[in-house]
């Protein structure tokens, strides 16, 4: 069963339709995905338009929608001002803030008027993530994960979208965020590796030291996971059992690791795209981890299927 089918079942069995807002109603791709989500009946997908003219002809009126130019935004501006005035925000800035669709969506999430947000088809990542960070808060360090799926195989690649050059401490949190997320997906067995160009001391250098340190920090915090976590490993050692038996004979895992923690954004972003384009894996994500509330950022190249899938994932993230 695919991860999306699994999550559909999980959301439906919860007995409550999560409300996931899509603040880019002027995007035809987003609107097609929203229509499909509405028809599927798994979640409630309200949308935001900036102007009445953006509402498409034949719009499905069963879908709740917000038109910013027609709204009284006073309540939302007051909320943002109270939330951000300690950072120097003035009321006029708060009023401008909530006239932006992405920022208004984050405000609605923060006020519990909706359960989560999916944005990024029309916005750059920095413009979707900034209001979410300002209003939703973080559990620790914000990172992301891609679910890489091919046939019955499911892998988790992190961080391929946000953490540019994480410190050892930050890399340990990236790993923690992803391990917890993979657990929430109901995986029967998790094997996580911290990737490097070195396998257990075969290489030297500052980059290796960082990965070794991150592994140690993670295991000091989670000693109960020692049998599930290893670092530093090269990718072939982590993925191919025959290679691992040669390079790391004391590591007794069977099969491949299924969580791959990349040392920096260069490696992670390149790695997931190679797996996607050359390896034939479907890349689902990036899924944002570490925020206090469910929020996910789309690629601007996202297809209707991508938007639909991220909507389902975000709905699943609302479940406790």
UniProtKB/Swiss-Prot annotation:
Q: In which pathway does it act?
A: Metabolic intermediate biosynthesis; acetyl-CoA biosynthesis; acetyl-CoA from acetate: step 2/2
What catalytic activity is recorded? acetyl-CoA + phosphate = acetyl phosphate + CoA
Q: Record keywords: Cytoplasm included?
A: yes
Q: Which InterPro entries match?
A: P_Ac_Bu_trans (IPR012147), P_AcTrfase (IPR004614), P_AcTrfase_dom1 (IPR042113), P_AcTrfase_dom2 (IPR042112), Phos_Acetyltrans/Butyryltrans (IPR050500), PTA_PTB (IPR002505)
| Keyword terms of this UniProt record | Acyltransferase, Cytoplasm, Transferase
Where does the protein principally reside?
A: cytoplasm
Q: Recorded E.C. number(s)?
A: 2.3.1.8
MF terms per GO, please? phosphate acetyltransferase activity
The record ties this protein, via Pfam families, to:
PTA_PTB (PF01515)
| Catalytic class of the enzyme | transferase
Subcellular localization, as worded in the UniProt entry: Cytoplasm
Among the entry's GO cellular component annotations, what is one? cytoplasm
Q: What GO terms describe the biological role, i.e. biological process, of this protein?
A: acetyl-CoA biosynthetic process
Task: Report the PANTHER family cross-referenced here.
Answer: PHOSPHATE ACETYLTRANSFERASE
Please name the NCBIfam families in this protein's record: PRK09653.1 (NF007233), pta (TIGR00651)
UniProt family annotation = Belongs to the phosphate acetyltransferase and butyryltransferase family.
From the Swiss-Prot or TrEMBL record, give the protein name.
Phosphate acetyltransferase
Please report the organism this UniProt entry assigns to the protein.
Mycoplasma pneumoniae (strain ATCC 29342 / M129 / Subtype 1)
Taxonomic lineage is: Bacteria, Bacillati, Mycoplasmatota, Mycoplasmoidales, Mycoplasmoidaceae
